[in-house]
């Protein structure tokens, strides 16, 4: 359990170090900016691997895995491959937040959920699918929101010549295209989450379920307006930040605010 906990902490530190990487690389400090990130990511992956040793022992003894445990094993493999790819593809940092977020989510489920809850989720496939889809959707939408803030910041600083162009910085058009793909992916995933969640709301009409449905739908509208505005109206800057932040706040209230009810 402690290995998994420290692995999650180092994954979070790695996520925090990805944003300054772009700024540091623009100032010619590419090696210095990569080293702290790589060390924290390496520590997270090693601790993640160690936390899976009991699962590997279960596999050797012929025991079956739960879906959560399989996801944890898959995520550490993906995280290791994506991190090593940083040395070959300079723009791989764009994918890493999604990879590390998936690792964090899988570790939380595999380590901290009680066996009773895991057994209940395994028996209810639709509920398990909905929860997994919801968590992944939130991760994608959250990363997309951080990405639009980073894009606006980079665009403004380049125009004001506060930072210099660098080979480590991808073209703004490429960054914007990647951002829009990620944002659109979040909107599609949120649509699927709302569709799958409708079934559970109809099965059990409770205040908590209605709270999640209403705020998730409002977030879907906010993200949808942002996507349409960027795609058809060419929105950039403040408008995109306002709608993106509004969407993630509404989604956060919908996903976690119901705990206060």
Model-derived regions, located:
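Hydrophobic transmembrane alpha-helical segments in integral membrane proteins
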Residues: 1-14, 133-141, 261
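A generic, lipid-embedded transmembrane alpha helix
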Residues: 39-56, 78, 106-111
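A mid-sequence, solvent-exposed acidic-amphipathic segment
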Residues: 157-199
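Juxtamembrane boundary at the C-terminal end of a transmembrane helix
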Residues: 253-261
